[in-house]
């Protein structure tokens, strides 16, 4: 809900003068892009730092003094980094591509909510985003056991959302462009 309301407020107040439907796509690319940088980039930096500490034999400088749950958590991170392979990288890239497509799609839907002053589109964007979070929640709860299945479900949901957003994008009319002669007459 937070992201969709944030998009709504951005389109409504901060980006008022951006009225072209392409601006919705651009906003979605920026929103999804910064999220991808933060999620993948910071995770990669963390994994590289852990791998460097392990490879240099310096990990003890971090683990010394840790006890119980703290030590278990650090050891779990080390094990995760050690087992990280190409399949994990592919899965992460696929997840971000799906998320990026979703951000663009939801930006178009929210843009239409602002442009046509129809709050129902904002509600729909919130509902679609919530639905998109269900497979990951089911995985976390142990209902789904395969990250590949989660990504496949997300892909299906994302493609449906993208098809709907494309329809909404095409339905949006471009604002009338004021020509130089129109401005001179005013």
Model-based region annotation:
Residues 1-186:
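Hydrophobic alpha-helical segments at protein termini of multi-pass membrane proteins
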């Amino acid at each position: 809900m937070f992201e969709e309301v944030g998009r709504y407020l951005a389109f409504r107040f901060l980006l008022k003068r951006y009225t072209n439907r392409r601006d919705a796509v651009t906003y979605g690319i920026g929103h999804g892009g910064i999220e991808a940088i933060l999620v993948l980039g910071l995770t990669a930096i963390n994994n590289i730092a852990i791998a460097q500490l392990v490879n240099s034999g310096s990990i003890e400088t971090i683990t010394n003094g840790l006890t119980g749950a703290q030590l278990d958590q650090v050891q779990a991170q080390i094990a995760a980094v050690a087992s990280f392979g190409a399949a994990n990288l592919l899965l992460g890239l696929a997840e971000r591509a799906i998320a990026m497509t979703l951000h663009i799609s939801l930006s178009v839907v929210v843009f239409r909510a602002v442009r046509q002053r129809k709050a129902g589109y904002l509600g729909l964007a919130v509902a679609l985003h919530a639905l998109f979070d269900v497979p990951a929640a089911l995985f976390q709860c142990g209902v789904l056991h395969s990250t590949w299945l989660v990504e496949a479900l997300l892909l299906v949901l994302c493609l449906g959302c993208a098809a709907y957003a494309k329809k909404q994008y095409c339905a949006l009319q471009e604002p009338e462009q004021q020509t130089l002669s129109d401005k001179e007459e005013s």
